[in-house]
Amino acid sequence: MTTPNPGQRLGLLGRKVGMMRIFTDDGDAVPVTVLDVSNNRVAQIKTVETDGYSAVQVAFGARKASRVTKPEAGHLAKAGVESGELLQEFRVSAEVAAECKPGSQLPIAMFQAGQQVDVQGTTIGKGFAGTIKRHHFGSQRASHGNSRSHNVPGSISMAQDPGRVFPGKKMSGHLGDDTVTTQNLDVVRVDEARQLLLVKGAVPGAKGGFVTVRPAVKVKLKKGAN
């Protein structure tokens, strides 16, 4: 396992289109998630001298001018960039930041087929959920003396000592709507004409949800590689 320089992890913002399957030359079916990463534009370059750190601010998507606050509209107009639905920073090295210019487009060609990437998204919200759905608890007995305690978690603490419920106890509560990163997904295909990335497997979030695609930070070596 190798770890690339974190300063080189400039990525792309996108939207989850959905899942499908494609077939390899050998006839194997591969499940893939289609990501739309079109129109990623540089909104600002941050440097150590002016901001205390190096970063590239990227805008994605389109938004009506009436839906943009005046400070953000002025900030984007300074770089000559149209307003977007998403505005996010990527912490990079000074060398990488120097290669980007405000108003320029980030090419999808920065990713290649066979490369491993980390995809971050917001999981689907499930609302208030019980312990069976939230923590995969098992149900209690359906009969044999069990009365109205089929799906309850059971005891949540001990006795007078310690006399409290320990923090972190698995109980009912809100499920989903979390920021999750799925690591080491293989890029199966890069469609430059339609600005689409096809990555193997599932990606966090619902259709239409925003995602962030970065080069994998924990690259797994293929079998047989030195």
Swiss-Prot record:
The gene is rplC. One of its GO terms (molecular function) is rRNA binding. One of the primary rRNA binding proteins, it binds directly near the 3'-end of the 23S rRNA, where it nucleates assembly of the 50S subunit. One of its GO terms (cellular component) is cytosolic large ribosomal subunit. InterPro entries: Ribosomal_uL3 (IPR000597), Ribosomal_uL3_bac/org-type (IPR019927), Ribosomal_uL3_CS (IPR019926), Transl_B-barrel_sf (IPR009000). Methylated by PrmB. It comes from Leptothrix cholodnii (strain ATCC 51168 / LMG 8142 / SP-6). The keyword Ribonucleoprotein applies. Part of the 50S ribosomal subunit. Forms a cluster with proteins L14 and L19. NCBIfam families: L3_bact. Belongs to the universal ribosomal protein uL3 family. GO terms for biological process: translation. This is Large ribosomal subunit protein uL3.
